[in-house]
């Protein structure tokens, strides 16, 4: 199934955090926090401004982004847990 977000929404798949600390301590699943990074899988066309023109999105498919731990709405698609959120919920794009 392919999703096409509407307006200024993006679809993000969470990227799992490391399960081991820098000193080698393994973090159990029960203590692990929700990841706050993800990969953009799809982007909407953009948000309409006051003049009715569509403002282009600042992110593109494949970008790695930072967001709040509780941002977006979780949806399950073909067994994958994805997030649908507004572009405004994104904090930054991780540059390589």
Swiss-Prot record:
InterPro entries (alphabetical): Chaperonin_GroES (IPR020818), Chaperonin_GroES_sf (IPR037124), Chaprnonin_Cpn10_CS (IPR018369), GroES-like_sf (IPR011032)
Keywords assigned by UniProt, alphabetized: Chaperone, Cytoplasm
Cellular compartments annotated: Cytoplasm
BP terms from Gene Ontology: chaperone cofactor-dependent protein refolding
A GO term for molecular function: ATP binding
Record-linked Pfam families: Cpn10
Classification via PROSITE patterns: CHAPERONINS_CPN10
The keyword Cytoplasm is assigned to this record: yes
Keyword Chaperone carried by entry: yes
Top-level taxonomic group: Bacteria
GO terms for cellular component: cytoplasm
HAMAP family in alphabetical order: CH10
Role of this protein: Together with the chaperonin GroEL, plays an essential role in assisting protein folding. The GroEL-GroES system forms a nano-cage that allows encapsulation of the non-native substrate proteins and provides a physical environment optimized to promote and accelerate protein folding. GroES binds to the apical surface of the GroEL ring, thereby capping the opening of the GroEL channel.
PANTHER family (alphabetical): 10 KDA HEAT SHOCK PROTEIN (PTHR10772), CO-CHAPERONIN GROES (PTHR10772:SF58)
Record-stated family: Belongs to the GroES chaperonin family.
Stated name of the protein: Co-chaperonin GroES
Lineage, broadest ranks: Bacteria, Pseudomonadati, Pseudomonadota, Betaproteobacteria, Burkholderiales
Gene: groES
